[in-house]
Structures are given as structure tokens and as C-alpha cells.
């Protein structure tokens, strides 16, 4: 092996190891946060659980808030296709919309412990809510590629009212699904999905 090839291999190995450490830290944090909640878990706990030093932790995350933000971003990226899946069905059909919302609520129910973590982080970490609101914007942008009702742009004055209506609709869906996952009444009432399906259908038909 030539010196240049050997050097390239070492660089690739170091990069892969760095990415692996980052994933290990995030995986360990997700497990600890689910088990104990966000506030009680320390950086030392996460480092120990992931098998890395504090120095290695700080190579990837400046603080616990940065870790929570990265974990939310990763979770949101994995969840986005589920929220956009309505595009692949007959979104003009109320039945299809209802089935889609039922799936959204069911998955949030399965991930309720992680949702609690993000709620706690949102309360104590400045800037976390902006990241969460960015996820709503991503959903709207994705839906807008196929569904005209969501194609309005927030930075165009004549379209902003329509965009805000779509933003509030998606926010309400996420909010009620979150509340239902934690067993909060009346969000866990099955009629909530019925009402949201009606509102979604009315929005895209208007």
C-alpha cells in the first residue's frame, strides 16, 4: 500500500470512528433520557453510558442542550417521511386522512417517553422551541410539493395567511398527538382524530 493510500485509509478510519462515537453518545442519551427524564441525566452519565470520555463528548456536543437538539433533529428526520406519507395516498379522501392521522397518533404513543424528554428540554433549553418549529416548517414544505393547499410561502405577503393556516393545522395535529400519547384528556378521545381529519380535509379543499 502506498503512503498516500495508507494515509487516506487512516483518515477514513478516524472519520468513521468519530461518527460512530457521535451515534453512540446520542443512542446512550436517548436511552437514559427515556428511563430517567431529561433533567436528571448529566453529561457524565451520558459519557459513561456511551463508553467515551468527557473530552470525547465535548468534541461532538458543546453542552447538554446541543445534544438534545441533535437528538431531536435526528428523531425529526426519521419521522418526517411518516408525516409526508399522506402525499402517497388519496389525500382528498377523508378515510385516507383519518388512517394517516391514526398512524401518526399511534407512533407518538409508542414513542411517548422520548416525547416527554423533548417537552422537558423545550422548557429549560433556550432555542429548543425554534428547532421544533422548524420541523413544522419542514412538514409544510414537504406537503406543499404535492398538495397545493400547503404550497403557500410564508415570505410572500399575499400567501402568508394561507401558510399560517397550514402551520396552525400541522401544529395542532402534532400538539394533540403529543398530548394523546401522554394520556391527557380530551386529546386521547378518538373523536379528536375525527375532528382533525375534518379540518385537514376542509383545508385542502378550500
Describe each PLM feature range.
Residues 51-61:
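Short hydrophobic/aromatic patch on the recognition helix
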Residues 61, 118-125:
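Short helix-capping/turn signature of helix-turn-helix
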Residues 115-118, 130-131, 159, 185:
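Short, hydrophobic secondary-structure boundary micro-motifs
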Residues 77-80, 107-110, 126-152, 163-167, ...:
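Amphipathic alpha-helical packing segments from all-alpha helical-bundle domains
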Residues 24, 28-36, 78-89, 172-183:
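Solvent-exposed, amphipathic alpha-helical segments
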Residues 59, 69-70, 145:
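DNA-binding alpha-helical recognition surfaces that contact promoter or target DNA
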Residues 70, 74, 84-110, 162-166, ...:
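Hydrophobic alpha-helical connector segments
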Residues 1-36, 40-52, 66-69, 91:
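Basic, helix-initiating cap at the start of DNA-binding domains
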Amino acid at each position: 500500500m502506498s503512503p498516500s493510500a495508507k494515509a487516506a485509509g487512516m483518515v477514513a478510519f478516524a472519520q468513521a470512528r468519530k461518527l460512530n462515537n457521535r451515534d453512540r453518545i446520542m443512542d446512550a442519551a436517548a436511552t437514559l433520557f427515556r428511563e430517567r427524564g431529561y433533567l436528571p441525566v448529566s453529561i457524565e452519565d451520558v459519557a459513561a453510558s456511551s463508553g467515551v470520555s468527557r473530552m470525547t463528548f465535548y468534541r461532538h456536543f458543546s453542552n447538554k442542550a446541543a445534544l438534545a437538539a441533535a437528538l431531536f433533529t435526528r428523531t425529526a428526520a426519521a419521522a418526517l417521511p411518516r408525516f409526508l406519507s399522506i402525499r402517497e395516498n388519496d389525500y382528498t379522501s377523508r378515510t385516507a386522512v383519518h388512517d394517516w392521522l391514526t398512524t401518526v397518533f399511534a407512533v407518538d404513543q409508542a414513542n411517548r417517553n422520548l416525547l416527554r424528554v423533548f417537552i422537558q428540554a423545550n422548557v429549560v433549553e433556550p432555542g429548543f422551541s425554534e428547532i421544533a418549529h422548524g420541523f413544522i416548517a419542514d412538514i409544510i414544505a414537504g406537503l406543499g410539493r404535492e398538495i397545493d393547499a400547503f404550497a403557500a410561502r410564508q415570505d410572500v405577503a399575499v400567501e402568508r395567511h394561507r401558510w399560517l393556516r397550514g402551520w396552525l393545522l400541522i401544529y395542532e395535529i402534532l400538539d394533540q398527538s403529543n398530548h394523546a400519547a401522554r394520556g391527557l384528556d380530551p386529546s386521547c378521545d378518538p373523536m379528536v382524530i375525527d375532528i382533525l381529519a375534518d379540518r385537514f380535509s376542509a383545508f385542502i379543499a378550500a
